Amino acid sequence: MAAKEIIFSEKARSRMVHGVNLLANAVKATLGPKGRHVVLDKSFGSPIITKDGVSVAKEIELADKFENMGAQMLKEVASKTNDHAGDGTTTATVLAQALIREGCKAVAAGMNPMDLKRGIDKAVIAAVTELKKISKPTSDDKAIAQVATISANSDESIGNIIAEAMKKVGKEGVITIEEGTTLENELDVVEGMQFDRGYSSPYFINNQQSQIVELDNPYILLHDKKISSVRDLLTVLDAVAKESKPLLIVAEEVEGEALATLVVNNIRGIIKVCAVKAPGFGDRRKAMLEDMAVLTGGTVISEEVGLSLEKATTSHLGKAKKVRVSKENTTIIDGMGDNDAINGRVKQIKTQIEETTSDYDREKLQERVAKLAGGVAVIKVGAATEVEMKEKKARVDDALLATRAAVEEGVIPGGGVALIRAITAISNLKGANEDQTHGIQIALRAMEAPLREIVANAGEEPSVILNKVKEGKDNFGYNAATGEFGDMVNLGILDPTKVTRSALQNAASIAGLMITTEAMVAEAPKKDEPTPPAAGGGMGGMGGMDF
């Protein structure tokens, strides 16, 4: 086992704080509308230029082991806030730095670290309660666009495209972000339920121009096994043909005689039909077929529930306004399922999302919710170069997550103003003893840090602006982009409540741990071993050779 180096108390904390400052100073340069870029070197490919706090934090690794511990703990604040709320990483870093710096100073002055931590925690709980009081729900597209714009570093085009995507697929809908091929951002919306399986035979195609199958007001047969004998289908085919309606068959596989018969009947015009493989595998396939059944008001014909294909009638079939099948995808538009049943199914899947521990399962379950609840929107990010594309895509990701957070918990005035109002509301808070009260004061001072940093990055004097904002009431704040004061909500400068709350709670959590640290243990640096002396003397018989 390698030897360890151990440092204690003030020496330990000062090395840790130095690491915190190095990381925080690099990250906080990106805060606010006039925040600067940070360039990150990559071992291969072009460097990355970013204004995303968590991207900067993730790249930082310090040579000194003890300083690096401080930096890594601060990095945890940024990534936890990013995972939980999708934005606010720089705010969290700035808050944590202020709490740690002031807290460690107080410990050095002889105050009890545990009481300081209790004071900070007490102030944060009170501040979070106050933020929830200030919070307003996001009810309209305009507010959603404003939140997305702020999170995308004041890029209105990104804000508007996210608001449009949310409007089209609903708040539960899936919005995915891809790299585009043009200079402009594009939005593609897939209505209804789409799954990645196409027609079983090109002979089903009825729209030759687009090379797709289009079925209007079709019946939908859902089966969880293979269909190879046409005898199994005769009852259903007869009933559907009598009503002169098209039919979509979704089964594990339609093959052999059954597929050939369907193709022949389709070509002759006896019945308009299309067969498609069921999506997914195993249990996930069963669940997706059940989703389709709920969406279309049908029943999955399965032996598990005592149903066989021969006995199936039109009452077991689902219905939809339109079905579109291409070579690779099937889209069911406007399923005729019962709304209460659909909502119940969505609720059931959401419970599974909360219980699952696998990220992959969670993602797949969220996709299922979206397909039942709204649809899928794809934002294609456009840019001139690959470097710009990566930077822009990261901003769109941030903006989307921040927007979801705003929809979830509402919005508060941005630009650090909500924290200033929370300070005013809880300024009379007292602890159980003097050290706890000092901890509360540390937290209240730290809550000024985001506004100070936004102003400093805009090239103004933080103390002057801060005092003016403190004198104001409610939403009155400073717009760093234009250098004007005004109502932050009317100016469209909004932050999701969840983002600010998470930033404050995560910053306080890590700061509390650092303040109460008394010893640090790291691997001792290896001493350089002396190099062995060079072999003496030349080689005999080599004299006269010119080297």
From Swiss-Prot:
GO terms for MF: ATP binding; ATP-dependent protein folding chaperone; isomerase activity; unfolded protein binding
Subunit structure, interactors included: Forms a cylinder of 14 subunits composed of two heptameric rings stacked back-to-back. Interacts with the co-chaperonin GroES.
GO CC, any one term: cytoplasm
Function of the molecule: Together with its co-chaperonin GroES, plays an essential role in assisting protein folding. The GroEL-GroES system forms a nano-cage that allows encapsulation of the non-native substrate proteins and provides a physical environment optimized to promote and accelerate protein folding.
GO terms for biological process, alphabetical: protein refolding
Taxonomic source organism: Xylella fastidiosa (strain Temecula1 / ATCC 700964)
Superkingdom of the source species: Bacteria
Root EC class: isomerase
Keyword Cytoplasm listed: yes
InterPro entries attached to this UniProt entry: Chaperonin_Cpn60_CS, Cpn60/GroEL, Cpn60/GroEL/TCP-1, GroEL-like_apical_dom_sf, GROEL-like_equatorial_sf, TCP-1-like_intermed_sf
Protein's name according to its UniProt entry: Chaperonin GroEL
Homology family: Belongs to the chaperonin (HSP60) family.
Catalytic activities: ATP + H2O + a folded polypeptide = ADP + phosphate + an unfolded polypeptide
Compartments where located: Cytoplasm
Lineage: Bacteria, Pseudomonadati, Pseudomonadota, Gammaproteobacteria, Lysobacterales
Annotated residues for binding of ATP: 30-33, 51, 87-91, 415, 479-481, 495
Coiled coil: none
Keyword annotations from UniProtKB, A to Z: ATP-binding, Chaperone, Cytoplasm, Isomerase, Nucleotide-binding
Main location: cytoplasm
Gly residues bias spans: 535-547
EC code: 5.6.1.7
